[in-house]
Amino acid sequence: MTVTPHLFIPGPTNIPDAVRMAMNIPMEDMRSPEFPKFTLPLFEDLKKAFKMKDGRVFIFPSSGTGAWESAVENTLATGDKVLMSRFGQFSLLWVDMCERLGLKVEVCDEEWGTGVPVEKYADILAKDKNHEIKAVFVTHNETATGVSSDVAGVRKALDAAKHPALLMVDGVSSVGSLDMRMGEWGVDCCVSGSQKGFMLPTGLGILAVSQKALDINKSKNGRMNRCFFSFEDMIKTNDQGFFPYTPATQLLRGLRTSLDLLFAEGLDNVFARHTRLASGVRAAVDAWGLKLCAKEPKWYSDTVSAILVPEGIDSNAITKTAYYRYNTSFGLGLNKVAGKVFRIGHLGMLDEVMIGGALFAAEMALKDNGVNLKLGSGTGAAAEYFSKNATKSATALTPKQAKAA
């Protein structure tokens, strides 16, 4: 019997059956008079996932990187000064994009395993009396190192300095899994993608934009050249329920069902489930005598754990053993932590028993590659935690059942 490898990477994530079935439909006319009846409510419901107070959400047929680019090109001009930090592969790539697009980037280089340096940001913003900095960037969840950063803290720093800079957030591996309070935190652009917390295949770049950022887009002269990722083209057609070019219609149908599942479970319950699963993984890591790449508990991510392996052991060998011997996929270490960590993704459509299987495979792969641990130690610690904290699995419920649960 052939079994599809068990997937525990930090994206793409597992796709619920209901979402797959929603996408398994014939092609449809994306310019039919009926199409807006589907898309207009979808745009509005997406705003709920970001907890927005105003503004709008754009859906591009791209990965999250496309949404990154759109956020930058539509709100900033070549030569604008921006404040960023670099502490993992994806925060690094965002800095690289901004530099290549012609922005003047002030970078705070931080140790991998830490996150956005809120105190440094506060000091830099307080000293920027002429408001030369036009935007401040935050990678909410750095998947390369399993680090989450304090978006609300950055907003407080901006407010304390009475600074008007835009607050730009990479929420690719956080939205739909970790709490994102875009309105409360005063986030101006929040980037996400379909393949993480939204539990879809890759292919949708989702960008939530505040009214402040929309107003800047409308009034500012000298902005970057753009075409495919233009806000103006999107607004003109989205208002009618359409798109400026061919949309990924099946993915949009899947997104509708994904949102229904998230709302049926309740966003706060979704976030609590991710915290429980992450806590179980951390209990296992501790029992194995290993450490996370994240340096302190304040940095711990509830969507992915990057686990440091002992010196002299190649983490790539562990992921290969897990894949070929135990039919389980874990994330590789990237860039500076390549060969030093492997990553367990615990986001999306997962519950305690599924995570238990991931830990079972990880434990055996670690042991097979010479890590000194006792089989059953990590899985036992996680089971102990889950047995005390688990609730009825939301992933097993249909939206109708979840409402009644």
UniProtKB/Swiss-Prot annotation:
Enzyme Commission code(s) on record: 2.6.1.45
Name of the protein described by the UniProt record: Serine--glyoxylate aminotransferase
PTM sites of type N6-(pyridoxal phosphate)lysine: 196
Any GO MF annotation of the entry: L-serine-glyoxylate transaminase activity
Family in the record: Belongs to the class-V pyridoxal-phosphate-dependent aminotransferase family.
Keywords: Aminotransferase, Pyridoxal phosphate, Transferase
Gene Ontology biological-process annotations: glycine biosynthetic process, by transamination of glyoxylate
Pathway per the UniProt entry: One-carbon metabolism; formaldehyde assimilation via serine pathway
Reaction catalysed by this enzyme: glyoxylate + L-serine = 3-hydroxypyruvate + glycine
Gene name linked to the record: sgaA
Cofactor(s) required for function per UniProt: pyridoxal 5'-phosphate
SUPFAM superfamilies, A to Z: PLP-dependent transferases
Signal peptide location: none
Pfam families: Aminotran_5
Lineage: Bacteria, Pseudomonadati, Pseudomonadota, Alphaproteobacteria, Hyphomicrobiales
